[in-house]
Amino acid sequence: MMPTPVILLKEGTDSSQGIPQLVSNISACQVIAEAVRTTLGPRGMDKLIVDGRGKATISNDGATILKLLDVVHPAAKTLVDIAKSQDAEVGDGTTSVTLLAAEFLKQVKPYVEEGLHPQIIIRAFRTATQLAVNKIKEIAVTVKKADKVEQRKLLEKCAMTALSSKLISQQKAFFAKMVVDAVMMLDDLLQLKMIGIKKVQGGALEDSQLVAGVAFKKTFSYAGFEMQPKKYHNPKVALLNVELELKAEKDNAEIRVHTVEDYQAIVDAEWNILYDKLEKIHHSGAKVVLSKLPIGDVATQYFADRDMFCAGRVPEEDLKRTMMACGGSIQTSVNALSADVLGRCQVFEETQIGGERYNFFTGCPKAKTCTFILRGGAEQFMEETERSLHDAIMIVRRAIKNDSVVAGGGAIEMELSKYLRDYSRTIPGKQQLLIGAYAKALEIIPRQLCDNAGFDATNILNKLRARHAQGGTWYGVDINNEDIADNFEAFVWEPAMVRINALTAASEAACLIVSVDETIKNPRSTVDAPAAAGRGRGRGRPH
């Protein structure tokens, strides 16, 4: 008699286990790597991605591309997550980390198919990663922070390496200098929020500028603003979160009046409340008034008559950056506008940039903030420029905090590959094969750099292996001359932190995917999702 089958899972649940599902997961990760493979390095190509709403994005950044791809495969999502975490943590190396993770999996795939236990693979990978990280720390070159000129040179080289694979690589020297200037203006915490990036269409890339202070787009203004002065020297700046306009009552207010005089008294009281606020602001000595909330036409004309400048509906982020630069604090009431709460700057002016008008605060006493104003043609191009600058800024921040650098262009990967290959020959058993596979996987970076530039990858990798075997630690791919070169001498530098982070994240992701022995897909997530989406809409009561 047949035993009754026990049904644990809901009908329609898709469950796959054993070696076939693990191989399937590894193959899914290869597909993700294929999507970003060609974007690596200075000769990398760009991707044009159009989302569901028809918005086009041109990008070369691994994390941006993977975010825009709607990945549904659960194992492949792991690679998307490590690219995002690399972007958040160090800013650059997002394509490298995805390629490394996929290549690690590709190298262990034959061992998995032969039935090697995943735990043996994981143990070997953890050993190899630890050895590789220690080796990077050992050979990384430290630049002394005391020597400001040397440190600045190092930071510019790191920024140029980060920008060399981007759309704006032709202007990398121009932007690298701007990026280093920007990060140097920040305080010791190096808060990214304190660097504003504003995009103005039109003009050439070289028209982009860095403002040592705050700049933001002119807000919507009411009639009367054209009478206000557009430039002040040493003004006091009032930063408010107060509405300065007459408005209908927000709540259900009810006023009962019996005579015309009663009504007039109410109207007068409303006007008096507004004028009282305006007078207090005027008497505080402030010449520039910024508010997060609207400043109406009456207030605009009142300030114009008294040679004051005002701007309402200023974005909160810009208001906070103005406060950080000019000092003072944001007030929610006008009753205590003393000198302590007002900000100051040397020059405030409103300037035309392209087709837009911008408000500039420069010469700020606490200038721990700055603003990039980017110029350029197409909107997508400027968005990609912003992403490229973000990567370069993150790299420079990392280089300031961790002042050790390694050579890029596949040099560090080749050195680690040689080191791990040599190490693997000293140990017996399966670990030897697996650490050898890890070492081979590291060669994907220089190989892909060659492929993307159209070089003969096999030939160049043979030269690199030979040179590293002779002790040429920093030899990597020379993109300009289709050969190998000492990339440290060529100033292809990047913070050691970027490589350490990429290796550990890629190795962890590979271990995570190898350690999964069963994939269970719940049917609810696929069947019920579209139905649930329409549920929240009100359909009105049937009459």
Curated annotation (Swiss-Prot):
GO cellular component: chaperonin-containing T-complex; microtubule
Modification sites for N6-acetyllysine: K67, K250, K320
Reaction equations catalysed: ATP + H2O = ADP + phosphate + H(+)
Stored CDD domains: TCP1_eta (cd03340)
Recorded GO MF terms: ATP binding; ATP hydrolysis activity; ATP-dependent protein folding chaperone; unfolded protein binding
Superkingdom per UniProt: Eukaryota
Enzyme Commission code(s) on record: 3.6.1.-
PROSITE patterns in UniProt: TCP1_1, TCP1_2, TCP1_3
Cross-link type Glycyl lysine isopeptide (Lys-Gly) (interchain with G-Cter in SUMO2), residue numbers: K430
Entry binding sites for ADP: G41, G93, T94, T95, S96, S164, S165, G409, E494, R499
Subunit structure: Component of the chaperonin-containing T-complex (TRiC), a hexadecamer composed of two identical back-to-back stacked rings enclosing a protein folding chamber. Each ring is made up of eight different subunits: TCP1/CCT1, CCT2, CCT3, CCT4, CCT5, CCT6A/CCT6, CCT7, CCT8. Interacts with PACRG. Interacts with DLEC1.
Name of protein: T-complex protein 1 subunit eta
Organism listed in the record: Pongo abelii (Sumatran orangutan)
Organism classification: Eukaryota, Metazoa, Chordata, Craniata, Vertebrata
